[in-house]
Amino acid sequence: SGGADGAPPHLELGLTGYREYVGTHLIDASERRALEDDGERDHGERGAHMANALGCEAVLVTSDGHAVLLRRSGEVATHGGLYNGPSGHPEPSRAVVEGDDKETRAVEAAARVRNELYASVLMETHEEVGVPLEKLKAPTLLGVMADPTGKPDLLFLVRTELDAAAVRECYAAGAEEG
């Protein structure tokens, strides 16, 4: 939540993974409806039994005002062949906190989750486009969006000090996932 009243956004997150996401979203329509109906009946929320892994996506803007789009492989499980910004998923393992004091752990975990959300969009941009991390500026959260299946993504604005030609060179030199 959060919004027009000026309150900061509030997200409630649980743990899930890509395999669970595929298992609850890329299934027969009747099976999906049954899961959604169960969620409505059991929890008053159609998406309660869906593994909606939180994604992150960047609108990468170059110093000369160009936005960078990537075409998704036809081999991926979802949205193959479509264009989007550098995107991926935060790594929950980077937000794990251990210790005995529950209150201290909760505060530290919240900070780690927040840091991971922002760090993951920079790492995905670096890995997919090849722009060095030191050439990327701090991300700005633009909002939250959902794809047609209900999977949520955080959308960030990420600026680079590189111009479009330099970004093309980074990409051509071999992004880590390219």
Regions found by a protein language model. Name each.
Residues 1-123, 131-178:
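N-terminal leader/linker segments that precede catalytic domains of diphosphate-processing enzymes
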Residues 126:
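Juxtacatalytic substrate-recognition/specificity segment
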